[in-house]
Amino acid sequence: MFPYPTLNYPPMAPVNPMAYRDPNPPRRRWRPFRPPLAAQIEDLRRSIANLTFKQRAPNPPAGPPAKRKKPAPKPKPAAPKKKRQPPPAKKQKRKQKPGKRQRMCMKLESDKTFPIMLNGQVNGYACVVGGRVFKPLHVEGKIDNEQLAAIKLKKASIYDLEYGDVPQCMKSDTLQYTSEKPPGFYNWHHGAVQYENNRFTVPRGVGGKGDSGRPILDNRGRVVAIVLGGANEGSRTALSVVTWNQKGVTVKDTPEGSEPWSLTTVMCVLANITFPCDQPPCMPCCYEKNPHETLSMLEQNYDSQAYDLLLDAAVKCNGRRTRRDLETHFTQYKLARPYIADCSNCGHGRCDSPIAIEDIRGDAHAGYIRIQTSAMFGLKSDGVDLAYMSFMNGKTLKAIKIEHLYARTSAPCSLVSYHGYYILAQCPPGDTVTVGFQDGAIKHMCTIAHKVEFKPVGREKYRHPPEHGVELPCTKYTHKRADQGHYVEMHQPGLVADHSLLSMSSTKVKITVPSGSQVKYYCKCPDVKEGTTGSDYTTACTDLKQCRAYLIDNKKWVYNSGKLPRGEGETFKGKLHVPFVPVTSKCTATLAPEPLVEHKHRSLVLHLHPEHPTLLTTRALGSNARPTRQWIEQPTTVNFTVTGEGFEYTWGNHPPKRVWAQESGEGNPHGWPHEIVIYYYNRYPMTTVIGLCTCVAIIMVSCVTSVWLLCRTRNLCITPYRLAPNAQVPILLAVLCCVKPTRADDTLQVLNYLWNNNQNFFWMQTLIPLAALIVCMRMLRCLLCCGPAFLLVCGALGAAAYEHAAVMPNKVGIPYKALVERPGYAPVHLQIQLVTTKIIPSANLEYITCKYKTKVPSPVVKCCGSTQCSAKSLPDYQCQVFTGVYPFMWGGAYCFCDTENTQMSEVYIERAEECSVDQAKAYKVHTGTVQAVVNITYGSVSWRSADVYVNGETPAKIGDAKLTIGPLSSAWSPFDSKVVVYGHEVYNYDFPEYGTGKAGSFGDLQSRTLTSNDLYANTNLKLQRPQPGVVHTPYTQAPSGFERWKKDRGAPLNDIAPFGCTIALDPLRAENCAVGNIPLSIDIPDAAFTRIAETPTVSDLECKVTECTYASDFGGIATISYKASKAGNCPIHSPSGIAVIKENDVTLADSGAFTFHFSTASIHPAFKMQVCTSVVTCKGDCKPPKDHIVDYPAQHTETYTSAVSATAWSWLKVLVGSTSAFIVLGLIATAVVALVLFTHRH
């Protein structure tokens, strides 16, 4: 920031001009010793210079004042004793000055942000951005600016905004917006805002009500977002914002559960009085002062949006200073108390246990479970104490040390944390869960059946958390006790008979009332008499069995459990926050050893050595994906076929890898016949075998035919002379028919005679057929030289128009290259390369499904009477009345009657707490749009990452050029009409429609959002008759269809999609699908063209391929020599589709040569090269590549390739010519003999 170091000597006035002198100059290099006189002269010169500078120097700044000596203490006279002075006030710590970035943000915000006033207070803010004023729609009030308040605003309810044009005098002084939002930190009124994963977040507690409308700025003071609200997500708050995309279109991003941040006060109700929820009236304003009234106030506002504010105000007692974590969260559970409930297994059978297990949740990873019991932890009867737990010891509350608590499955569990009714533990796998404690010599425990298992993360089934590996998203129960928006339902406890309140006084039954309490009594002697008393009361009954006394406990809540009876009459409900809620986090997962990879010709061999069961998935990147999915448990070796289209495999938690096959092979297509056969046999084994068999068959047929013709001709010649004795054969026939001389009987004798008497003639006789064969071969070669060529050539890609149109393959990374030719101008090089392509369908969210939770309210037990069900609009609500029940409570009878009692049992479905982090979304998918990001180069202009729509209609402005691409030649999409999104995976799944879900299958629980009230459930829920002597609500239902679908969901679309598609979310899209072709049209501006007279003219072009490896990434090297009219730059391009050139242009001298690289799929390429306006043909032979498989796709097209090399064609012509020569020779001999015989006869 400061380029110069601080001076450590008094400043001097510089001599104009004076260069800066470094106080710490670099060391000088060694110099020879100077004479003493020269050194003295130099020192004198420096001293004079210093004196001159010092005379011009200004006065140095004053230094610190000198320390004064303390005077000797003088003896003071004895002063009279004064009162003790109060301690001095504590000096307040000075607030730290904000940083430069924050100061700039605050200044810009204060100048261009205006408060919105409502009833004399700030309700939100409006900001002026880009010539318009933006005001949140949910913020009521008037802008505190006369000019802006007079503007007529337009409403955009979809974005929760109002906007209008600012006056002309204010347009020059407005904030500018930007769509650039790289991940990092931004500024707003309260400090830094973090932007990551397309979300703006701030630490929890930073920002809140009244901050709606504030802008978020980048370091250059540009607005990147406008805040509308927020949602608490654990330790951070996700902001609901309005942003702009790259096209300047407004985009609203609202996290789940976000609330608008206007400062409008939410009102609560108490009886007929309304009051601000954060300021309850003084009568029930504090739980410690008025517990019953406070609970009633909370129950009446159960459904209020500001219930949390009211609960917080009631617990903190309005202005009382509290400790941060302990008092804020633990004190909520001081409104509740433990209870005794039924437990099916207490170690010795069924019992009423003080630590009965209500619920167990084990949907998190890494073996964590959350246990809900009837005991309470971290609380005592007199307040909060983390070292204690409390439970009901009969009718009294008792507290013991928490160290006596334990939990176990197949082995002891590790207690991680505890709070209220809940325990967070990490347990080993097991089929049962036991929770207990020891109170002196008495042991209390409760065991229920619940399967606990370790749930690994990712694609490897490890059994213990690893020390290191890869971080993957997972679900955990947060260790914090902070409220997370999840509640546990509470209510005031029902009446339970307490026989200790009854005693005999003389001959009458006396009811003893504890101090400050009320007791409800019910007596039958013989008339029924009931009532409520706050003091001791003596009845007219003479037997204790004739009365029941119930202690009314309306100062504490208990959990709304199905194991407790409900109070009589209309009972209101309350709620407290659930601790240890499931949240999305990061877990360390194992990373399987890398596979040992072996590359072969068109084959990939993987040697796998898993340490635990590991998933291996593969797919081909062509039109037929051929996906495979298998769990590997033992070391094994697997083989896969790899083609030029590509192959992808994913091993365990490693990222997917893609490989492509090259046209490698043994042998040499330009070598000897056996090398050619080996080469083609490795590439095309079946075709090579068929070709060789065909050649052998042709040779055999040719030889047999030739021999038969010659034999037939000879017989025709010799037969007439055999019939005439002593006939003399003409010389011509003797030569043609090889007539045996009289001195030899057969061929062997003739050859023996010639060998012994005239070897020269013997060799001449042998060479005659060979010479004839060679002559025939030459004749056939001349006939076949004009046959079909073995190379196919693509059409030229040049264009002779200002507007250039072409078709390019839809393959990412493969550039399209061409020379755009325009009359009178030099050719302009054009290159278009796809960076990414996106198929974005129109997705309509049908519903969200997740795991359900069965809610069992406390049953209504009517003693000696009947009750009935009432209709309720709850999901899958079931209600049934059972008669003839005889419940017991803690060992005593609950009712007088034996068979006239009734119980109304209720049960319904609600979302489980895990739904916030573990849910599936069902979408209906329709035809969407195709977008692409392209890199374009024309001439000397390059444009990177241009966004275009691939629809053939929407042009994109690329500098001064206009580009229109699309539509795709194939209207294809990897998505079916119905898809399911689960986490980061997408599945094609035919889910049921909304409202038609079946029990035990996908969609048994449906809702539009995670917080909406349109919850639908079908779980085959059936109520069962309660057992005698037990207060409970038994039921049966189908297992969760969502959990069943998760086990049977199969492979995600990302593992089975053809054409190498990568499936992504937000929004739902398929990226980089190599399907079809893309037509394109580009209008190139005149400025990109150069007059042909200004470019060099090239002549005498000669091209020589120096090195070539076909089917390899630019494995060809060629050199072109030239002569140019002048030096300059020339574009180079191959108009043939056989080769792809790496270079775009070259720099030419007057004469010389340049080298370029090319890629081709032909083994004998012959392609044209255009340099400026001149064209030369390059030819050469290419060798096969050495690498069988590579990790990059081919840069050339394989549509036009040579199947057979020129050398192979030459050998094939020789073979065909040789075999044909035998037939031709026989035909010639037959014709000559037939002609001679015909002439002889006539």
From Swiss-Prot:
S-palmitoyl cysteine: lipidated positions: C717, C737, C738
Biological process, per Gene Ontology: fusion of virus membrane with host endosome membrane; proteolysis; symbiont entry into host cell; symbiont-mediated suppression of host gene expression; symbiont-mediated suppression of host toll-like receptor signaling pathway; virion attachment to host cell
Residues at the site labelled Involved in dimerization of the capsid protein: Y186, N219
Disulphide connectivity of cysteines: C850-C915, C863-C895, C864-C897, C869-C879, C1061-C1073, C1103-C1178, C1108-C1182, C1130-C1172
An example molecular function term from Gene Ontology annotations: RNA binding
All residue ranges annotated as the Peptidase S3 domain in the record: 112-261
Transmembrane helix found in the keyword field: yes
Designated name of the protein: Structural polyprotein
Span list, region Binding to the viral RNA: 83-113
Catalysed transformations (reactions): Autocatalytic release of the core protein from the N-terminus of the togavirus structural polyprotein by hydrolysis of a -Trp-|-Ser- bond
Annotated segments matching region E1 fusion peptide loop: 885-902
